[in-house]
Curated annotation (Swiss-Prot):
GO cellular component: cytosol
A Pfam short name: Ribo_biogen_C
Gene: TSR3
Known catalytic reactions: an N(1)-methylpseudouridine in rRNA + S-adenosyl-L-methionine = N(1)-methyl-N(3)-[(3S)-3-amino-3-carboxypropyl]pseudouridine in rRNA + S-methyl-5'-thioadenosine + H(+); N(1)-methylpseudouridine(1248) in human 18S rRNA + S-adenosyl-L-methionine = N(1)-methyl-N(3)-[(3S)-3-amino-3-carboxypropyl]pseudouridine(1248) in human 18S rRNA + S-methyl-5'-thioadenosine + H(+)
Subcellular location: Cytoplasm
Family: Belongs to the TDD superfamily. TSR3 family.
Name listed for the protein in its UniProt record: 18S rRNA aminocarboxypropyltransferase
The keyword Phosphoprotein belongs to this UniProt entry's keyword annotation: yes
Residue positions where Phosphoserine is found in the record: S24, S259, S264, S282
Superkingdom as given in the UniProt entry: Eukaryota
Source organism (scientific name): Homo sapiens
Class in the EC hierarchy, top level: transferase
Enzyme Commission number(s) from the entry: 2.5.1.157
Length: 312
């Protein structure tokens, strides 16, 4: 008989076992706390000096299709920092996969799945979804994200248009690991803004127990926002508001000059005929109508006089 062939592949000695033992959430939480502590050390949030892949207690992966600008792509930056590993088309990911073809929302019910197998995203352009081969990015746990607002500079303020790092962070917040979201968002100057914009919603989703409850929380939020729209408070002295001009002394709907002076004069001094009953009121209305007609003709006559003087 020949020699026994040496073991190969993920199950080989020294390699990663094919089936990992179940991970306790308590031990995972301790690893998350250690990773957060390492990320806040001096120099950890400055880019290349950040923590390596061993600093994160779970796997982060990404299918990168090359649709985005490499200088603005948050997924590529995380990959350069060693926080995310790139997958090729056709590779299967065993953890939670954020995909537009998912059938249910990510929820706290996925907490153990994320702790055990991690999260993967699809880095593609929102404008090219029709040509994205989602069937070649395989996974057993496809999920969607509920209503959230983007804070990245490209799609700031637009719902659902999250970048890769925002998708990772949202998933961690929903399943109950917000410290992991902080670790990733610290790599971007605008990262904290994502949590500030969506704090209320993320807390609502994290308090749910199932995908159905997350869907219900989303629907309730959107219904309340539609029923009670809040008027925008505008600071007239805010130079960064984006408004080119504005007059705080006049309502926006006003289309003609106010006639407060004429109305106040008429109300304060109605004339001697006002004490004589209804007949006097109709007479006053006729006089006011004639007066308004004369005022309407006056600007036209003045304009004709100006044009005549210009011709002369």
């Amino acid at each position: 008989m020949g020699r026994r062939r040496a073991a190969r592949g993920p199950g080989a000695e020294g390699g990663r076992p094919r089936h990992l033992p179940t991970r306790s959430l308590e031990a995972f939480a301790e690893e998350v706390g250690a990773a957060l502590q390492a990320s806040v050390e001096p120099g950890a949030a400055d880019g290349e000096g950040g923590p390596g892949p061993a600093a994160l207690p779970c796997t982060l992966a990404m299918w990168e299709l090359g649709h985005c600008d490499p200088r603005r792509c948050t997924g590529r930056k995380l990959a350069r920092l060693g926080l995310v590993r790139c997958l090729r088309l056709g590779h299967r990911f065993g953890g939670l996969v954020l995909s537009p073809v998912g059938k249910q929302y990510a929820s706290p019910a996925d907490r153990q799945l994320v702790a055990q197998s991690g999260v993967a995203v699809i880095d593609c352009s929102w404008a090219r979804l029709d040509e994205t081969p989602f069937g070649k990015m395989r996974g057993s746990h496809l999920r969607l994200l509920p209503y959230l607002v983007a804070a990245n500079p490209v799609n700031y303020g637009r719902p659902y248009r999250l970048s890769c790092v925002e998708a990772f962070a949202a998933t961690f917040c929903i399943v109950g690991f917000p410290d992991l979201a902080v670790i990733l968002l610290r790599k971007f100057k605008w990262g904290k803004g994502f949590l500030d914009l969506n704090r209320q919603l993320l807390d609502k989703y994290a308090a749910c127990g199932s995908p159905e409850e997350v869907l219900q929380a989303e629907q309730e939020f959107l219904a309340n926002a539609k029923e009670s729209p809040q008027e925008e408070e505008i600071d007239p002295f805010d130079v960064d508001s984006g408004r080119e001009f504005g007059n705080p002394n006049r309502p926006v709907a006003s289309t003609r000059l106010p006639s407060d002076t004429d109305d106040s004069d008429a109300s304060e001094d109605p004339g001697p005929g006002a004490e004589r009953g209804g007949a006097s009121s109709s007479c006053c209305e006729e006089e006011q109508t004639q007066g308004r007609g004369a005022e309407a003709r006056a600007p036209a006559e003045v304009w004709k006089g100006i044009k005549k003087r210009q011709r002369d």
